[in-house]
Amino acid sequence: MFKLVSEFEPTGDQPQAIEKLVEGLNRGMRFQTLLGVTGSGKTFTMANVIARVNRPALVISPNKTLAAQLYQEFKTFFPENRVEFFISYYDYYQPEAYIPTKDLYIEKNADINDVIVRMRMSTLKSVRTRRDVVVVASVSCIYATGDPNDFDRMNINLAVGDRIDVLELAERLARIGYQRTEDVSLSGCFRLKGDTVEIYPTYQDEGIRIEFFGDEVDSITLIDRFNRTTLEHLDKIIIYPAVEFITTEEKLKRAVESIREELNERLSELKKQGKILEYERLKQRTLNDIELLETMGYCPGIENYSRHFDGRKPGEPPYTLLDYFDKDFIVFIDESHITVPQLRAMYNGDRSRKKNLVEYGFRLPSAYDNRPLTFEEFLKKTGQIIFVSATPGDFELSISEQVVEQIIRPTGLVDPEVEVRPTAGQVDDLVNEIVKVKERGERALVTVLTKKTAELLSEHLTELGIRSLYLHSELDAIERVEVLKKLRRGDVDVVVGVNLLREGLDLPEVSLVAIMDADVEGFLRSETTLIQIIGRTARNVNGKVIMYADRITNAMKRAIEETNRRRRIQLEYNRKHGITPRSVIKPLEIEVFEQFMVKEEPERYGDTVKNIFEMKKTLSPEEYMAVLEEEMYRAASELRYEDAAALRDELFRIREEIKKKKGL
């Protein structure tokens, strides 16, 4: 079923890791962990495991940048199988919210990326129709999507010779989300001309032409979307829905009736509680929505009524991508030390935001059920899970029936030496080290604690003739990748940033990582974070890490000890097998963003820092500070450290501005 294509055979620790993981799956182990160091080829190991067990797979990544990279790699490994991409389709997302302390209502605002919509629909179709499927997804996969049973039931099966007239087909297409139009460049539409119907699905590049002779299907052909030439003649075809959420007229009527019932119950509660303002607000808003649903079949915020459309009971989980898979699918949770906390945080973050909307009469209680899965529901809807990380968390290690280590790299590279140097004169010392790196034609990364420090240090290095750029959270993913491409090409010598882990991209040219203020305890200098930072040099034979600190914290001690443990194992393996380490040689490829026009849209669990900063224009300083503080704690709990640090810096800046205005 799966055909793995690679010019390389598994080497180093990969063969034993593959064998152990496959054996664990075959023995029915529910949870396993692949503890693989940076650069050990964890993606190749995952691909080999998938090919060996021949089962559909879902790979969950902590962010879209990493998801895009994994998607590209799996496409290379499985060119003859289906590899799909499933991330949030929002280019911009500001969720609906209410802050009662400020009496501030924030309306939902969103832009949808049509390219991602197409890729999501392709995913749903592939998962429902084939088994040789690998889906690379972000945490969006635990958010609500359409009922898979509706997706199956409402397919249109057509074969040459079938008796159906043109208008009947047009009506059926409209019922599953296709719009009639003359603009054939659009996806999810159809064109009607005489006895011919041309259909342009959202899930594939090719169009479909159905030609009729009277009320009989005369021919079915696949056509080129743009010049409309014939590509292939078919005897039969299945046309799948154009949208994720499909609503029949019967479902719509049932939903409206159910919404009315809930509204009456809730209004009765508010009246008893003496909440007159909330009573009137909810009554007016919900009746307006009902009127739109009855006349247009749609209303703004329709997703808040999803429970009524699905026929779910209060508290029942929504349908998600997980419900589309066959029951024996495997889940890989990549960078599990980040992704697992994100999966845990989604439900509570969503519910806390909606709590105010429900309590203050902006939404019915059923809005709670338009939500992501709880972590417990996620575990119930999945079967066998393999956690993948260089630094797995306590949860993964405690629940796994086996932890498989992948310490040896195929290149023979060993973990870098870690030096601790005093902070006195650290900038001058750093400059000297960067000059040495530059002379060897290599690159450096410097990680600092604040955005302001990153800017100042980068400017200082530039003044000294060292080509430097800094990474910060206000750059979107495409801009961030462009900075890293400049580093790889040699257009710049060093990149300075607050959290250089976010990308997780391969940077084989980097031989030096400098960690400034390594002894300042906090989320940016935890054991896990330090080990991940150290791993940034693990693809270069000259890799070295310098921690600037005046004391050794517990986090530093544990990170250095773990790095030295791995280094000893790697050196012994190389000595035993006569291996000479060599740097990774990796061509500068076209990035996935350029290939698929994937923009970095915020996940529904939180806005990008850029979007939050935009709110300053419409809020008072006190309101703005309340939003900053709430989002800062949320970002930190989800291990989005750079976002948390940027929000913290902005919060401090606004506080200082207020103090100055008050003359304090």
Swiss-Prot record:
NCBIfam families: PRK05298.1, uvrb. PROSITE patterns: HELICASE_ATP_BIND_1, HELICASE_CTER, UVR. It is found in: Cytoplasm. It comes from Thermotoga maritima (strain ATCC 43589 / DSM 3109 / JCM 10099 / NBRC 100826 / MSB8). This is UvrABC system protein B. Residues 622-657 form the UVR domain. The beta-hairpin motif is involved in DNA binding. Forms a heterotetramer with UvrA during the search for lesions. Interacts with UvrC in an incision complex. Belongs to the UvrB family. The gene is uvrB. The lineage of its organism: Bacteria, Thermotogati, Thermotogota, Thermotogae, Thermotogales. It comes from the Bacteria.
